[in-house]
């Protein structure tokens, strides 16, 4: 399929985010990603993601599905989205969720995996304990461990749907193309969701959101539990955590791929007649969200 590209006045800015840096302490990264879970909940992201995944699963033949999420952080909106799907859309199907990350949070891994035998929702969620690079072949990484997650998926007969929620903007164009290519080669659906479509604020004004983001970070910190004494100290007495939250949130819009830039990435992939890509925007509570869907045809 051919896609027409459009040129932008100001291209995407690949600024750094604190949580991406190898020198970022794990406890700061884990706290910031836990705060992001709260933000997703407030903005209604689990509902949006559940609706979109439900539409994709409805078009697929099969009785069992596994959603493999990359760049999961502390879980993001997927666990709550899965709960909505199981309650409303997929009662006649088995749906599981496998969370993965380059730097799996120890607290998140323990929280999800220790509850695997507690209730229908908890038993449907697992966090892959080893580092997983979203830019490398996904199924190969899952199958490299003894009794790996990939092997269990094959034995289970599950159809795989990939997701990347609020993580695509972390990838440079070369990395982003690898994620798209692996999904296309594997002929597995891929759903990419971003909190913004990259148009608000204008890219050259990305920095104006730093002060309100900092105040917002203080507010979000109050509702992010559980919390340690150290996290409280560095949230309110020495507010390093809200500062990191503010910076990462401000540069997200500047890093987010706009529609034309996404289709530029598609142009780098081998032509395929049996896999299609779609970019669309979804109305949000504050700004428009962007949604990228790849699927076999």
What are these regions (language model features)?
Residues 171-186:
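A short, conserved alpha-helix within the catalytic core of class I
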Residues 267-297:
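C-terminal lobe and adjacent flexible extensions of AdoMet/dcAdoMet transferase-like proteins
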Residues 183-200:
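Conserved beta-strand signature within the Rossmann-like core of class I S-adenosyl-L-methionine
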Residues 203-266, 272, 278:
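C-terminal alpha-helical "lid/dimerization" subdomain adjacent to the S-adenosyl-L-methionine
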Residues 167:
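Hydrophobic adenine-recognition pocket in adenosine-nucleotide-binding enzymes
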Residues 65-143, 148:
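Class I SAM-dependent methyltransferase SAM/SAH-binding core
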Residues 1-69, 74-76:
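Class I SAM-dependent methyltransferase Rossmann-like catalytic core
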Residues 162-163:
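A conserved beta-strand element that flanks and buttresses the S-adenosyl-L-methionine
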């Amino acid at each position: 399929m051919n896609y027409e590209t459009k040129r932008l006045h100001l291209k995407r800015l690949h600024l750094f985010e604190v949580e991406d840096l190898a020198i970022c302490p794990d406890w700061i990264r884990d706290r910031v990603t836990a705060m992001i879970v709260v933000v997703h909940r407030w903005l209604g992201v689990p509902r949006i993601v559940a609706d979109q995944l439900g539409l994709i699963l409805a078009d697929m033949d099969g009785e069992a599905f596994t959603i493999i999420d990359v760049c999961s952080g502390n879980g993001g909106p997927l666990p709550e989205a899965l709960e909505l799907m199981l309650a409303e859309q997929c009662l006649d199907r088995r749906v599981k969720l496998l969370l993965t990350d380059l730097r799996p949070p120890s607290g998140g891994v323990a929280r999800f995996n220790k509850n695997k035998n507690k209730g229908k929702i908890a038993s449907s969620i697992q966090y892959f304990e080893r580092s997983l690079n979203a830019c490398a072949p996904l199924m190969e990484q899952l199958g490299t461990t003894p009794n790996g997650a990939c092997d269990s998926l094959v034995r289970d007969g599950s159809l795989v749907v990939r997701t990347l929620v609020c993580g695509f903007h972390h990838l440079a164009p070369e990395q982003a193309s690898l994620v798209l290519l692996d999904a296309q080669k594997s002929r597995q659906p891929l759903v990419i969701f971003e909190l913004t479509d990259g148009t608000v604020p204008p890219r050259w004004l990305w920095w104006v959101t730093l002060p309100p983001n900092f105040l917002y970070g203080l507010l979000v910190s109050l509702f992010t539990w559980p919390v340690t004494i150290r996290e409280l100290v560095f949230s309110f007495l020495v507010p390093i955590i809200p500062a990191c939250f503010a910076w990462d949130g401000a540069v997200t819009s500047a890093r987010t791929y706009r529609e034309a830039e996404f289709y530029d990435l598609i142009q780098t992939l081998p032509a395929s007649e049996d896999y299609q890509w779609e970019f669309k925007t979804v109305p949000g509570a504050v700004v428009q969200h962007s949604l990228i869907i790849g699927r076999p045809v």
